[in-house]
UniProtKB/Swiss-Prot annotation:
Family in the record: Belongs to the UPF0161 family.
UniProt topology in membrane: Peripheral membrane protein
Organism: Francisella tularensis subsp. tularensis (strain SCHU S4 / Schu 4)
NCBIfam families per the UniProt record, alphabetical: membrane protein insertion efficiency factor YidD
A cellular component annotation (GO) from this entry: plasma membrane
Annotated function: Could be involved in insertion of integral membrane proteins into the membrane.
Pfam families documented for this protein: YidD (PF01809)
Localisation: Cell inner membrane
Superkingdom of origin: Bacteria
Entry protein name: Putative membrane protein insertion efficiency factor
Record key words, sorted: Cell inner membrane, Cell membrane, Membrane
Amino acid sequence: MLINLYRYCISPFIPARCRYYPTCSEYALEALKTHGILKGLYLTTRRLLRCHPLSKRDYYDLVPCKNKKG
């Protein structure tokens, strides 16, 4: 998976800069695991677009729970 490639081959060589907990790569893995490929990619993309120095968001940004109907 591309996220694991980034985490183990690229991330160790660049300074930690993620503004959130969990990190963006951890968030992406959890979002994909919890919500599947489509919603997981949507949530990950939204998160990456918010992760920048001018962001006014809270430090904690957790993957939303999966809604169960019924």
